[in-house]
């Protein structure tokens, strides 16, 4: 009896798929071309999905590139003297080699680098510009700065000898009217004005106005001598978190806190440990607002796609009233006919999704390759619209779109139950 029931179910499923296939094949084209209902439904799904792909790709690309620039310049965590945050300038912290070794051995940290900083003036014979000179050691990761280089090279920085070279931004170079190889004077205000001459080794541009108008980079040895510090005294330490679990930044923060708390007991200094998000709270709050906007756009596009596919299904049902009547007269149940039209609509949705994927992914790849849509870096930190495609969210978006589209069709398909065979066949 169970086998007989299963055979019946299989036959009904085969019947529904067969009828849906016939309707799809015969209803897809008429003498005048493709049916408007099918075109409307497919276009709505395609355009909705394409816009959703573009929205996610642009937003994720924007967040990723902006975050990379922030962390590329100052890493994930910064450790400085606590009193600096209270308004006391140029107070060093002690950074012994064992502290760096302990951080690097924690497993939650992949890189550490010391830095020293001092505010001053860069000047030429005709003009001057305020700046913050950042001194770095031989362990400094220049990969981000090298990716932002417009010309020249990064200076060779050590903690044992002055390089006499400086890396400045394009904004500074334009103001000072200097280029690679030119010499500039740097003046620093202390009890007496102290000056240093530097050769411009390279010019960078991050498109972050906060960085480009302020920071120049040289060796840490020069800064330690200017400040009168010992070799183990620095402005702070920058730490890069290991991306090895769900919350790598928090684990790296805890590791840094443990090391520097122990150092505070030994040296009597107070250390302030801050993450990139804390240092750039306004920027990351703005990025979070973008996520809210993305959610609203996705809901809107899903609603538009759902509206068009529902409209298309209802039009197809009304056009196929006589077919529904004939199927009912032959003994087909309302649920069976509803499944038939849902299968038909699902095929239309899949066809529209295929077209939407092609359009959305193609536009993203074109923008990645040719950067056709520019941005004002003064306002958006980037010079072109970023697009970041990842397979996992692309697959997830397609699955959610298909499931929600089919679920939205269940209600409108109930119109089939109102079709009376006698009236619909006579009407035809």
For the regions a language model picked out, list residue spans one by one:
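N-terminal Sec/SRP start-transfer signal
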Residues: 2-49, 428
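Hydrophobic alpha-helical transmembrane segments of multi-pass inner-membrane transport and secretion
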Residues: 33-62, 288-323, 346-355, 403-409
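Hydrophobic, regular-secondary-structure patches
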Residues: 50-132, 157-160
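Hydrophobic secondary-structure segments that place a key small or acidic residue at a functional site
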Residues: 116, 131-136, 153-222
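Mechanotransmission and gating elements of multispan inner-membrane complexes involved in transport
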Residues: 189-294
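Transmembrane alpha-helical interface segments in multi-pass membrane proteins
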Residues: 314-316, 323-368
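Short helix-loop junctions at transmembrane helix boundaries
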Residues: 351-397, 410, 414, 418
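Short cytosolic juxtamembrane segments of multi-pass membrane proteins
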Residues: 414-428
């Amino acid at each position: 009896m169970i086998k007989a029931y299963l055979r019946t179910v299989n036959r009904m499923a085969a019947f529904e798929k067969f009828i849906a296939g016939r309707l799809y094949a015969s209803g897809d084209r008429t003498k005048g071309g493709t049916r408007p209902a099918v075109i409307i439904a497919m276009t709505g799904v395609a355009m909705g999905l394409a816009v959703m792909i573009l929205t996610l790709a642009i937003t994720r690309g924007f967040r990723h590139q902006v975050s990379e620039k922030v962390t590329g310049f100052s890493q994930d965590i910064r450790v400085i003297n606590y009193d600096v945050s209270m308004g006391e300038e140029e107070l060093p912290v002690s950074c012994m080699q064992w502290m760096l070794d302990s951080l690097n051995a924690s497993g939650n940290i992949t890189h550490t680098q010391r830095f020293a900083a001092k505010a001053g003036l860069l000047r030429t014979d005709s003009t001057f510009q305020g700046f913050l000179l950042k001194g770095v050691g031989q362990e400094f990761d220049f990969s981000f700065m090298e990716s932002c280089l417009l010309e020249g090279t990064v200076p060779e920085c050590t903690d044992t000898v002055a390089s006499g070279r400086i890396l400045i931004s394009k904004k500074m170079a334009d103001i000072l009217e200097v280029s690679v190889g030119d010499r500039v004077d740097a003046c620093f205000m202390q009890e007496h004005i102290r000056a240093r001459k530097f050769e411009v080794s390279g010019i960078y541009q991050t498109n972050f106005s906060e960085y480009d108008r302020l920071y120049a980079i040289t060796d840490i040895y020069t800064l330690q001598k200017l400040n009168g510090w010992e070799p183990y005294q620095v402005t702070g330490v920058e730490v890069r978190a290991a991306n090895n679990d769900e919350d790598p930044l928090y684990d790296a923060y805890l590791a840094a806190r443990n090391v520097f708390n122990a150092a505070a007991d030994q040296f009597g200094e107070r250390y302030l440990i801050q993450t990139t998000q804390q240092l750039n709270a306004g920027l990351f709050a703005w990025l979070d607002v973008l996520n809210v906007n993305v959610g609203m756009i996705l809901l809107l596009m899903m609603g538009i796609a759902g509206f068009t596919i529902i409209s298309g299904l209802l039009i197809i049902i009304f056009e196929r009233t006589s077919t529904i009547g004939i199927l009912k007269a032959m003994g087909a149940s309302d649920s069976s006919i509803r499944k038939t039209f849902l299968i038909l609509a699902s095929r239309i949705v899949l066809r529209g999704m295929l077209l939407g994927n092609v359009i959305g992914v193609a536009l993203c790849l074109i923008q990645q390759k040719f950067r056709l849509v520019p941005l004002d870096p003064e306002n958006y930190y980037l010079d072109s619209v970023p697009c970041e495609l990842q397979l996992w969210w692309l697959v997830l978006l397609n699955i959610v779109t298909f499931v929600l589209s089919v679920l939205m069709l269940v209600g409108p398909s109930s119109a089939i139950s109102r079709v009376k065979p006698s009236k619909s066949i006579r009407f035809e």
